[in-house]
Amino acid sequence: MNTQLDLPKALHDYIKKSNIALALSAIKDDAPLLVVNKSFCEMTGYSEDEVVGHNCRFLQGPDTTESARQPLHDFVHGDGKDSGRFPILNYRKDGTAFHNYVFMSRLKDTGGQPQFILASQFDMTTALQRSKISLNDEKLQDALSDVDQIGREFGLAMMGSAGLLADSIALMAKLTLEDSQR
């Protein structure tokens, strides 16, 4: 275990090495970010040092709607759903807006108690091409499979993620088709 972050070292290392934008937050307090990877930093323009310890609300801005914020808040601070997907308008460090599609899953211990929230982010502003969506889908499937395996080694579990992942992929494809028909 990485005692500084109180999370399995293998999970920490996997997130850092992943090619898709990943962030891991604590369940406790205000869900502070514990670790983010290079892809997350490239997408948002923030360094890891700037974001670790903070809730990801720093990505919200003047045009982020309450109707987009509330489902994220309910997921993070509620205990009903084990996973969810959330479209939200976020802002990079330089102030530019981007349409973020966030997939979140609770990582639970063997006793069923949530320990962490794993979030993957997709910039839908630039990912509205089929090839990019397909590539993101493949990377996300690989990432979820690897994280699930790593998590099991340390008594963590991702509950109900496969069905939600399939729904997310279908929705992303639908959004792409709708956008290309405009």
What are these regions (language model features)?
Residues 111-165:
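Sensory coupling linkers of modular signal transduction proteins
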Residues 60-77:
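PAS/Per-ARNT-Sim sensory domains
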Residues 25, 105-107, 122:
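Output-coupling edge of small sensory domains
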Residues 31-34:
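Conserved hydrophobic beta-strand signature of PAS-family and PAS-like sensory domains
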Residues 48, 55-57, 63-64:
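N-terminal sensory regulatory modules of PAS/LOV and PAS-like folds
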Residues 21, 84-89, 94-102, 118:
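PAS/PAC sensory module
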Residues 26-27, 75-79, 88-95, 108-110:
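PAS-family sensory domains
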